[in-house]
Amino acid sequence: GGGGRCGSCGGVGASTPITCDAVNGAAPTDDVAPASDNVPFEELAPHVETTFRQMEADCAANTKPAGLLDHVDTVSVARDLDVLRALSGNEKLDYLGASYGTYLGAYYAELFPANTGRMVLDGALDPSLSQYERRRGQAQGFEQALRNYVDWCQAGQDCPLTGGTDAGVQQIVDLIAAADQTPVASSDPNRPVTGQEIQTIVLLYLRLSEGSWTVLNTALNQAINQNDASTFRVLANETLSQSMVDVGVFYGNTCLDYRVEGDMTTWAAQSQELEKVAPHFGTLYEGGDLTCQSWGHSGTQPPKALHAKGAAPIL
């Protein structure tokens, strides 16, 4: 059969892409947002609304054909995937999906079970969850991953984090907060490293296996003990441009996959819940429904479980 791999597909690259202004192209995605400064949701909301309305207008003006922003949901991407399968002359689609790619693979198997070949979904997203439930789960996952990293670090050599798990977590949080106030000097004299950049790198490395965590040890050791963020500077230069999916693509796809649920009162309560269940990362995940309402292109169907009846076994 034909092979496919997807980590974050749809609306990018040599397909017909969503195109946004370069300034907005570097705007924060789902989990790369300003470091938490505990601004109440009610104060943040008008800024979110203005930002995403402007961004949508910009993306709509730069994206051809007109109307594409209403057709980049996962169901549409799955249908495109089946067209690619047919054009390549394959009876079945063999597919490896990670992250968002698991969501796409699940929808493909639901829509085209007879065309589904060998499919592996690594770390599957649950399609029956609402956008808020998904974001809450992600925030909790990062919160646990941060604790796992600190435990791993303290059990090994050359760990800059002292005390127990809570103390180690707090040292990272304090570093981020301090760098937000006064960016930390790096090997590039014109580019000290901000708390937001440190937080983003920490989040990216928490997604990786323990084999990559020694790099985080090195970066934190320099920053905490030598007030030198050179390693963070290198990591930011290397990874941020690659990992920060164009925000227009991200929200263009995500918002069409979920209908907007709740109102300002609901979202303020959810914001408080997020800060309770994920005190260090919760604020990065608040306001998803408000964002999509402001973006102006959202789904209409409630989330549902997918069963892919008739498809070959999926791993």
Regions found by a protein language model. Name each.
Residues 79, 97-109:
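Glycine-rich nucleophile elbow surrounding the catalytic serine of serine-hydrolase chemistry
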Residues 167-311:
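Alpha/beta-hydrolase fold active-site neighborhood
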Residues 5, 13-37, 107-171, 205, ...:
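A catalytic-pocket lid/entrance helix-loop region that shapes and gates access to the active site
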